[in-house]
Every structure is written in C-alpha cells, then in structure tokens.
C-alpha cells in the first residue's frame, strides 16, 4: 500500500468545511495487525484497511482524526519516492514524517452502521453521477491505476451502494448513498 496515494484518495472524499467539524478529517484506527482509515462526507464513504505497517507507527487500540487542512499542506511536501511514516506517539502527537499534524477532538461517525452485509435485492436505485465519478477517482488513486475494478453490492433503493476491493496487503470499501429521484 502506498501511504501517500491512500491519504490523497481519502482526502478526495473528506469535506473541507462541513458544519459537522469531525467530518473534516480522516479517522485512523489501529486494531491489532491492521490499520483502518475512514473518510466520509455523509453521502460518500471510503474505508481503507491495511496490514502493511511499514510506514505506520501507531500503537494498538489508538484512534484519532487527522484534520484535513493540516494534511493538505503536509502531503504536498512528499513524493512517491519519499514516503514518510505516519506516527502517533505516547502523548497522542501525530506526525507525518517530521511534520506535526493537527488532530480533531470529536467522535467520528460509526461507519459500520452503513457498511453492513445484507441479501436484500432492489430493482431501481438513484445514483448521483458526480459523486460516483468523484468516488471512482478516489479508488483509482488508491490502486494507482485508471482501470480499477471491484465488487458492487446494492442492498436496497434507500440503502448504500457498496464497492469492495481486496488485494494482498490492503483492502478498501467505497460507499455511495442513493440519490432521491
């Protein structure tokens, strides 16, 4: 997993100035041998899970929200050949390489409420093509290819559209809420 591409993809789904301030960032959770990144604006969601911890120095059980504005500035100083380590120390100070990141003190939404398995079928569902294109671009950024394919799950006309992708050392879920037509 390329950390910089992953963060750039997550930023494509992260709002810039949502009144729900806790959404203006990326949630990072260390759970055992896995790190989970979540980003949502309330209509789209992107979740990336990785077991590739080479550039992640985060203690088990720790979670935090990285402020989008802080990450926007920092990420531009790194290149594909210069991958920094995302670190959270014992005092909960978060850094990307040697640069400090601002974190958001708040409760991130329970993303697993919308990422759930179901066998319910539906014939018609509304899709906002602009949001679909934006989410598609984020997925292509993670995989670093223009031809990204994945599994599509539609549970119901009023439920989310789920895209699942799984690779050797990481996986991600992209989610799009249905549009009212």
Task: Indicate residue ranges for each PLM-predicted region.
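DNA polymerase processivity clamps
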Residues: 1-181
């Amino acid at each position: 997993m390329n950390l910089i591409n992953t963060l750039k993809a997550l930023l494509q789904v992260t709002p810039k100035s949502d009144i729900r301030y806790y959404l203006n960032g990326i949630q990072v959770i260390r759970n055992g041998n896995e790190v989970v990144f979540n980003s949502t604006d309330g209509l789209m969601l992107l979740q990336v899970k990785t077991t590739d911890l080479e550039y992640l120095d985060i203690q088990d059980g720790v979670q935090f929200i990285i402020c989008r504005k802080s990450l926007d500035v920092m990420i531009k100083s790194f290149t594909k050949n210069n991958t920094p380590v995302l670190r959270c120390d014992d005092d909960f100070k978060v850094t990307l390489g040697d640069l400090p990141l601002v974190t958001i003190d708040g409760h991130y939404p329970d993303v697993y409420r919308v990422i759930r398995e179901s066998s319910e079928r539906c014939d018609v569902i509304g899709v906002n093509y602009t949001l679909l294109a934006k989410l598609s671009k984020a997925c292509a950024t993670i995989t670093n290819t223009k031809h990204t394919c994945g599994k599509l799950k539609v549970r119901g006309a009023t439920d989310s559209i789920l895209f699942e992708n799984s690779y050797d050392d990481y996986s991600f879920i992209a989610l799009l809420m249905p549009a009212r037509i």
